[in-house]
Structures are given as structure tokens and as C-alpha cells.
Amino acid sequence: MKKIYSTTLLAAIFLPCNMAVSAQEVAPMLTTKYSQMAPYNNSCPEKSAAGCGPVAIAQILTKYKQPVHGYGTVSYQSGANKYDVDVDFESYTFDWVNIKDDYRGEYTDQQAKAVADLIYACGAAMYAQYGSSTGVNNYAKMLYGLQHNLHISENARYLRRQHYSTAEWIEMLNTQLRAGHPVLYRGSWLFEEEDNGHMFVIDGLDADGKYHVNFGHFGSGDKFADINVLNQSGTNPGGRGVCYNAKQAMVINCYPTPEHTDYPLQRCISEEAIILNKDTLLRQITVNLGENFTLSCNLRNYSLQKATLNYGWGLEKDGQLIDILCQSTDGLSAGEKFEEARHLDVALPTTLEDGEYKLVLYSMSDINPTWSRVWASAPTEVEATVKNGMAGITVPDNHLGDPKLYLEQDITEVENTFEKFVPGRTFELKFINPTTNNFQNKIKLEILVDGEEYSYITIQPVFSQSKTIYHILVPQSAVAFQGKHITSIKASYYNTLDDDYTLLGTTEPSAVNVPTTRVSS
């Protein structure tokens, strides 16, 4: 068996905010300026917050003024408060005539009810968990409800940025915008061990490659933003300023198709990158026909019911299924994924003719008794090139390798613009990721203050092929700065492959010695 490992260093390819792939201006498509409180939450249980996800979907539907009504029914108990959510969508006729774009001025009771009913219907379809901070916690159930109850396109898919290079991600996002479709987007603001997730809408693109964001807060903070920053407030991630730059995901093809009715009751979604022979970095091998190799996957159950799943790798030629080469069986609860990846041994038939083939995940269940392609949240198609009794097997790039991060220049101290809220000191780090590998893990600052060493750790993403400026705020509560002198500061990132920190220098990480960077006190 011959193995080939990928080389992902792309030292000359960077995609900062002003270099979006195939950038083409798209004017902001939404004219709505909704939020989560009155009148938007008037129909929610006990006047709970409307929820950022329902507000985002309601704004998208208002652009299209479709559907006329919802479809089917939903019944569930919501969150810790155990609110009963029971909605007969057929009885919800959306009053598009009376749904205003902006409720910050005067409005009638009828106009208030129209938007409140729309947003509550969106929340019920998304299986929102209602409370003072309403959230949508399961994307598979959310997608199921959006399609079955609001007739969002059958091609709608939930994609996670971590599984794609920046170039791939931007091209997919731009394709949606050019087609005239706003994109349901989510991100997290990570600060002081808090993970504040938020759903919003990206609905435009400017000439500099920045994306117009409708954050769903009465229009407050709406702006064109760098996709690597997504700052609602402040300018740079890493501190008190709200930037939804982490854990990015989007729903593509998120638009209503009222005429479509044939949505599946159960499918599987590929949750993670495909791993070859249990080796994260292995991209390609050559095997004999009939020789076993291992493909690892994880699946999520797109259904409202527990399902008994049969799943396996199908062999395709020119888009047609030839055979299911291997399969396994597991039970999986509604909306849930496997706790651990599943490892399936695969062997290509010894009689296979020369040519190009694909290995594709298929599944069936007691709810959906027909073998169907698994939906992809991450790339899943495995290439198989057969020639003279041998096969080259290539899995998609999983973007999990070493990002080889380094700094564009020395660390400098900048003003803490949030001193009033979080006393401390702020340091500017200009990260460069020259690879196709995405990073989201620990960044450690080691600070020498009057001879005493301190460490401060923050978790942040540095996406592939990008240059991103971080303003990392180190709180006074973490490091005793007051009245003291900073002697030196150095930074490192946690490398999961080595299970250790890699020092960050101002040259590419092939450098043997990474100097300590000094800052002014």
C-alpha cells in the first residue's frame, strides 16, 4: 500500500477581507430591521425573546413574501421552562400586506400581530428553545422544520466553515448572493471563556469583498464586514468588542419554494470530514483491487424520530450507483449524531474496469427504506482511479493539518477601548495562516511583568489563506498589570497534531528560533 500525505502550504495565497474570490458587488437585499423584543416576540410563550434564528429566517421570508402559510404541525416542549409549543402551520396565514419592514415608529395592532405570528411560526419550525435568551440548538431539527413547515428549498444545506478552505467558503457564499439569495449565517463571539452564539443574515457584498450583515438588532450594527471578523461592535476580534468570527456556519439555498412538497421524513447528514485509514493527515493511498482500506465518517439523523440506520459506502460511476460495498447498522435519536466516528472497511471489486469512480456515503432506515445519498455538511466524495488492477484512493482535504501560523509583525500594545467595561491591556497580533488548514484553538500569551511570568489563553479561529488582525484583551483580573512594567511578551498556538504549543514568530514557522517579542509598557 502506497501512502501520500498532502502539502498544504500556500505561501503566496492570502484572502484578506479585500480579496474575496470572484468578488462581484451585490447590494444589500433585506430592507427589514427586526429584533427579538416587542412587537416581534408578542406571540412567543410568556413573551420570551423571539430568538435570533427565528428573526433571521423571518427577515429572509419577508424579502420573498412567501410562503402564504405554513405546512403541517409541530408539537414539542421547549427548554428549561418547559413551554408547550403547539403550532398548526396550516392555520398560520402570513399577513404579508401588514408586515412592515421596520417597527421602530408607529404601527397598528394588526401590523404587530402580523410580524409576531410570522416570527413565532419561524421559531416553532426551527424548534427554538424559548426563554430570556431563546436559542436554536439542533441544526438537523432546524433544517427539517424549515423544509417541512416553511417549505425552504429541498437543496438547503447546513455547512460548517471548518470543513472548507477560505477560497471554497467564499466562492459558495458569493454564489448564493449573486443568485439573489440572502444567507442564514451563524457565528460565535468567544471572550473570557464565554461562547455567545448568534444567527444573522448575510445579504450583500461590496467591491472590497466585505459582506453586508443584518445582525437582527433593529438595524444596530448592520454593516459591511470582513468575513473573518464579523464585528457587530468594535473593530477586531479577541476582546470585549462583539465579533461573531468563531464557529462559522451557513445555510445555503435558504429560500422558500412553496410549490415543493416532497420532503424526506428521514435522511442522514455527514457531520465531519472523511478520514482515510484513521490517519488525519493521510489524503491518498494506492491499493490493489480487493484490498481493504478504512474510511471513517460521522452521521447525524435528519428526522423527528429515532431511526435504525443502515449506512455504508456506495460505488458510483458517472453519477450512477453501482453497488453498496460495505454497510453497518446503528440506532440514532432524532437530530442527534454518533458519539464517535464510525470506521468502515472498504474493498473495491476485483472485477472493476479501469476508469474514474467515486465512493459516496449512502444510508437507508426504517423510516426511509430506500438507499439515498447522505447529505453533506462536510465534503464526502472520495475519488477512486482504477488502472491495471490498482486503485488510487483520494479523500477530500479535511483542512485539519498544521496551519503553520506566524505573525506579520511584532506584537504591539494598543489602546484598550473597553477599559470602562473590562480593565486590562490589549495587544495587537497580526496573524497569517498560509495554508488551507483552518485553526480554532488555544492562543497563549506569555507575559513577563516586572520579572513575574503570567500566561493568558484565549480560543480564537485563524482561517486558512488569511491575514487577520486580533486585538487580544488581557483582563486585569488575569494579569496584575496595574502600576507594573511589561518586560516581554510572546505568543504561541496549540497544535493538536503535536499536542503542544508552537511559538509564533515573525517568519514562517520553518524558522528554528522564534524570538521573544518586546512591547512598550
Label every model-predicted segment:
Residues 365-374, 494-503:
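Short acidic/polar inter-strand loop motif in beta-rich domains
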Residues 144, 148-214, 221-222:
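Active-site-adjacent substructure of cysteine-protease-like catalytic cores
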